[in-house]
Swiss-Prot record:
Cellular component terms (Gene Ontology): extracellular region
Its job: Required for the conversion of the yellow polyketide pigment synthesized by wA to the conidial green pigment.
Lineage, top ranks: Eukaryota, Fungi, Dikarya, Ascomycota, Pezizomycotina
Any GO BP: pigment metabolic process involved in developmental pigmentation
Names of required cofactors: Cu cation
Binding site for Cu cation 3: 125, 513, 585
Name of protein: Laccase-1
Pfam families reported for this sequence: Cu-oxidase (PF00394), Cu-oxidase_2 (PF07731), Cu-oxidase_3 (PF07732)
Cofactor note: Binds 4 Cu cations per monomer.
Catalytic activity: 4 hydroquinone + O2 = 4 benzosemiquinone + 2 H2O
Annotated Plastocyanin-like domain residues: 45-141, 270-372, 463-602
Organism field: Emericella nidulans (strain FGSC A4 / ATCC 38163 / CBS 112.46 / NRRL 194 / M139)
Protein encoded by which gene: yA
Length: 609
């Protein structure tokens, strides 16, 4: 059985209007019982009575006004993930930086320009409410005359028109994760046990996902070979999770209290079932479809594929890229990947597979791509979607997120496709400032620092948002902030610091608010140079300050093992274009709750203006 509601493409065509519209939306937040995965209901956030919140669709440069009504029993905010907010920094939605929290029973109106165009999402930026369901997808259609990258896909005029129609009318695929615990309960288990907890009950796609319990033996059979490196001779739990007391995963920060971790959190698996979302497509109407995946999970990264359908990745983090044809794509929390798919298969149903990517749990969730014109195919020949465990011989990807053949092409989460249609980054000689981070655990297994060994909480300045302070460093200690001057190019070295107590770091998806940044280099070992100019002179092959640079707002570090390396780093480069109280943080919810963030105060030399 599939969902009875047909999920038609987003209904507003790009009419080619050159003037900006004024668009008004209302989001009412409520705290009610729900069960997106068919398991035990728990209290969660609904937006306008829905989970996830409604898709918000705008045209580039629309003037947007969103009234948020907070009927939750908690403070909250809304962050518009990926939007620049250059003209309206007060709308960025970070408590303590751009606003005071929206208190229970209160309202707040966000006003901003819908810019840049592309795939985005919105979510709470207050404590762990994103994990409780305060999320929704957002899409901004490009102007009709925007330069597009599709010539590498096809030169056929009809196909190019169909591709642009698909771009303007995508299916937004919001991937999240779910646990029967509220975010506050989840975090309290970390505090009481001392463990870094990252196990979930299920993945969800557009708010739906079943719980499968195929047994740990099967889960280990389909898991990535790299998982062996962290299991320390143990087995996965029935839930597909790592044992909670693995020394190389938790670091040397004991003692821990295993009794404070309920068995349902990590060990027990209780199956449940909901109908998968169905994406209906009609190749006779339009021969291409765009699926725009949003990494909205609190704890998990994902890999996705569509059975029998190669995909052209054409947009990452809202930015057009040089298209690449693949069968599997890895996505970390905060990132967005749009793929263009040609509808040229036998009419039928095909599984859209979404699996955990990251080596910390083995599980999958499914949606279905359904051709509407199946009637003329003999019933026995109509393809049926193979979903659930033990369907690994079908499609490109197995239940554990691994490929089913060496011929399967995969875009890894560490690969960054070159940006399309934008100038390359400037040479390193034009950079005015080089800033450094130092990612490391502090004091225990669940507290993470982005730099200076500090644990940052945006709420610590909730009553005095830094945007409205003439001297922000008089309100927040300098160790909690990185500062820049206006109209300058800045490099930030995102570096993992090796520590003998802190053996393994998972990949960290570091998200930057405000404008995007170029990824200009990465490497293993310590970043031992004063700046990129010095590093380029010694190891030029590690840098790409040219047209191959990616332009993103989420930057994912590679898997780190201090037993094999003494550091790892990524360098990003961006232009400071105005006063902006930005933030740089890991988008894994438990890491951010554990302190992994720094204020990024741009343009402090013009702050009092």
């Amino acid at each position: 059985m599939y969902l009875s509601t047909v999920l038609f493409p987003l209904l507003a065509l790009n009419l080619g209007l050159s003037h900006a519209r004024f668009v008004r939306e209302t989001l009412e937040l409520t705290w009610e019982y729900g069960s997106p995965n068919g398991g035990t209901p728990r209290e969660m956030v609904f937006t306008n009575g829905e989970y996830p919140g409604p898709d918000l669709i705008f045209d580039e440069d629309d003037d947007v006004e969103v009234l948020v009504i907070n009927n939750l029993p908690f403070n909250t905010t809304v962050h518009w993930h990926g939007l620049e907010m250059r003209e309206t920094p007060e709308a960025d939605g970070v408590p303590g930086l751009t606003q005071t929290p929206i208190e229970p029973g209160a309202t707040f109106t966000y006003r901003f320009r819908a810019y840049p165009a592309g795939t985005f999402w919105y979510h709470s930026h207050y404590k762990g409410l994103m994990q409780d369901g305060q999320v929704g997808a957002m899409y901004i259609r490009r102007k009709p005359d925007a330069l597009r990258p599709y010539a590498v896909i096809t030169e056929d005029p009809r196909e190019l028109a169909e591709i642009q129609y698909a771009e303007d009318n995508p299916y937004l695929m919001l991937a999240t994760d779910w646990t029967y615990l509220t975010s506050a309960e989840y975090h309290n288990i970390e505090v009481e046990s001392g463990y870094n907890v990252f196990c979930v009950d299920s993945l969800l796609i557009n708010g739906r996902g079943s719980v499968y319990c195929p047994g740990y033996q099967y889960l280990e059979e389909v898991s990535d070979d790299g998982l062996t490196a962290v299991l320390e001779g143990t087995h996965l739990t029935e839930k597909g999770c790592l044992q909670p007391d693995l020394h190389n995963v938790q670091g040397d920060y004991g003692p821990w209290n295993l009794s404070a971790v309920p068995t349902e959190v990590v060990f027990n698996c209780t199956p449940s079932s909901v109908e998968p979302p169905v994406i209906y497509v009609d190749p006779e109407f339009n021969g291409w479809v765009s699926l725009n995946f949003i990494g909205g999970a609190a704890q998990k990264a994902i890999t996705f594929s569509v059975d029998n359908h190669p995909m052209w990745v054409y947009e990452v983090d809202g930015q057009f890229v040089e298209p690449r044809e693949v069968e599997m794509v890895g996505v970390y929390s905060g990132a967005r990947y749009a793929v263009m798919i040609k509808l040229d298969q036998t009419p039928g149903d095909y599984a859209i597979r979404i699996a955990v990517n990251g080596g910390d749990q083995v599980m999958s969730v499914y949606a279905i791509l359904s051709y509407v014109n199946q009637d003329w195919i003999h019933r026995e020949n109509v393809p049926k979607a193979a979903i659930g465990p033990h369907t690994d011989t079908v499609g490109y990807m197995n239940y554990g997120g691994g490929n089913t053949s060496a011929d399967v092409r995969q875009l890894l989460f560490t690969e960054n496709l070159p940006a399309f249609g934008v100038p390359p980054p400037p040479p390193s000689s034009e950079v005015s400032t080089t800033l450094r981070t130092g990612m490391i655990r502090v004091n225990n297994s669940y507290s993470w620092s982005l730099g200076n060994n500090v644990l940052y909480e945006p709420e610590m300045t909730s009553s005095t948002p830094l945007l409205f302070e003439p001297d922000p460093l008089a309100v927040i200690a300098p160790k909690y902030a990185l500062t820049t001057e206006n109209n300058t190019w800045v490099d930030i070295v995102l570096e993992i610091t090796a520590d003998p107590r802190d053996l393994i770091h998972p990949p960290h998806p570091i998200h930057k608010h405000g404008n995007r940044a170029y990824i200009i280099g990465n490497g293993v070992g310590k970043f031992r140079w004063e700046n990129v100019s010095a590093a380029e002179a010694e190891v030029p092959d590690l840098f790409y300050v040219n047209e191959t640079a990616a332009l993103r707002d989420t930057f994912v570090t590679d898997f780190f093992d201090s037993r094999l390396m003494d550091g790892a780093w990524i360098v990003i480069r961006y232009f400071v274009q105005d006063k902006f109280p930005s933030i740089l943080h890991c988008h894994i919810a438990s890491h951010q709750m554990g302190g992994m963030a720094l204020a990024l105060l741009d343009g402090v030399d013009v702050w009092d203006s």
